[in-house]
Amino acid sequence: SGSCTSQVCWNAMPKLRQISEALLKSHIQAYHMMYSKRSLKLRPLQERNRNPSKTDIVYLTPDYCEPNKRHGSLGTHGRRCNKTSTGVNGCRLMCCGRGYQTMLRHVTESCHCRF
């Protein structure tokens, strides 16, 4: 007597929740890279225990400190900054580590006061 057995195999996608959690984890652990003009290679902006693998997410941010006509950036050299601000207009961020000069101006204005 002959018996026949059949085997069916298929691949199934993981649940959407599993996919989204994996993507979120990859996004959070993404490597912020910087292009080194000296070595002509990408290197991580922050030191880590290992270099990114082929499956890790990496990203670049343009250097807004230096002028780049191709990308429409005028750079930050010569612009005024706010010494007390921690935002994008603050000297710490805008001056890109180049330092800055403090300028003190004395302005006399008429306040139209009446006594």
UniProtKB/Swiss-Prot annotation:
Glycans are attached at N82. Palmitoleoylation is required for efficient binding to frizzled receptors. Depalmitoleoylation leads to Wnt signaling pathway inhibition. Its main location: secreted. Disulfide bonds join C81-C96. The keyword Protein biosynthesis does not apply. InterPro entries: Wnt, Wnt_C. SMART domains: WNT1. Keywords: Developmental protein, Disulfide bond, Extracellular matrix, Glycoprotein, Lipoprotein, Secreted, Wnt signaling pathway. It comes from the Eukaryota. A lipid is attached at S1 (O-palmitoleoyl serine). It is found in: Secreted, Extracellular space, Extracellular matrix. One of its GO terms (biological process) is Wnt signaling pathway. GO terms for molecular function: signaling receptor binding. GO terms for cellular component: extracellular region. Belongs to the Wnt family. Ligand for members of the frizzled family of seven transmembrane receptors. Probable developmental protein. May be a signaling molecule which affects the development of discrete regions of tissues. Is likely to signal over only few cell diameters. This is Protein Wnt-2. The gene is WNT-2.
